[in-house]
Amino acid sequence: MVVAVFTLTSLSLAACGGSSPRTGGVTITLYSGQHVQTTDALVSSFEKSNPTVNVAVRSNDEDTLDAQIVAEGSRSPADVFFSENSPALEYLQQKGLLAKVSAATLAKTPSKYDSPIGDWVGVSARVSVLIYNPRLIEKSALPTRILQLANPKYKNKVAFAPGETDFQPVITAVLKAYGKNATTKWLNGLKANATSHLYPNNETVTNDVNRGLVAFGVIDQYYWYRLRAEIGAASTPSKITFFAPHDPGYVLDVSGAGVLKSSTHKAAAQRFLTFLVSAKGQEIIAHSISFEYPIASGVTTAQPETPLQELQPYPIDLAQLGTGQRAIALLREVQLL
């Protein structure tokens, strides 16, 4: 999702998704920054399993929803926030706006994918990759480490979307590994190399690499899988590859959900979180067009092909990924936002 500027007009966010309202029971409001189709499938299945609970879905970019929840404060109609990336949840946690997730729900997923203090639960995972077009660049000629993207030999060959919230964890990892000065130099070099290939979103990066308009780019893996599913393997000459094991460009981040402290339907909201990490909820994620990794044990996906447990990402935990604010500040400093 793209970093957006929050305005009061977003307070009028219209409800979408979910099933038609049913009579009786309780209605919880879900603020969702996750993929609409997957969210709708999860909500529909949850409502069938919980006939006394209706879910009203309000979808928008996660950063916009973050700002909206903060602006609404104790008056927020949101009961649950479902994000694409952990920094959005960490931001609300830091603001003290999230309630504790039930211990039984947290026990369903590995603790490394959850809030370190139990304020939100991890639901699915994604990993940063390079997408490349072998018609323009051979795999052996690709950078294997994130800092190499600033090498002048890649000028006009690399694309990325600096406004995507998916890119913030990568910057945070580079900051952790190399410090601010080196990260600033890297971003300026990457900016110079991307030139006309600084894109508004990862969909554009994915499409243009696939069409042969630019050699390679940085995305999360699911964008490529989603494109291939939409247009077919025969129309997808592009490929994806990982950075070197444990390089800070190789970042695993999680999508998660939390209950708002201001929720007036906490019991029903907690039930929804429990469903997200249940076998049924995780199977929906495993077979959805989101192409993310389910994180509950015993649930696997055919796509992505590399199993979650075989990934070798940079060793950074969710607390260290933080709220993403340092990454945003640095992007603004180098005028990429």
Model regions and ranges:
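C-terminal motif of bacterial Sec signal peptides marking the signal peptidase cleavage site
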Residues: 12-15
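Early extracytoplasmic/lumenal segment of secretory-pathway proteins
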Residues: 17, 22-90, 337
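Extracytoplasmic ligand-binding site segments that recognize negatively charged/polar headgroups
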Residues: 32-40, 63, 76-214, 224, ...
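Short amphipathic alpha-helical coupling segments at ligand-binding clamshell hinges
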Residues: 42, 186, 220, 255, ...
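Periplasmic-binding protein-like
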Residues: 126, 156-162, 188-191, 196-199, 234-261, 275-299
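A bilobed periplasmic-binding-protein/Venus flytrap-type ligand-binding module shared by bacterial periplasmic
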Residues: 131-136, 252-265, 284, 288
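An extracytoplasmic/periplasmic, membrane-proximal ligand-sensing/linker region
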Residues: 181-183, 290-337
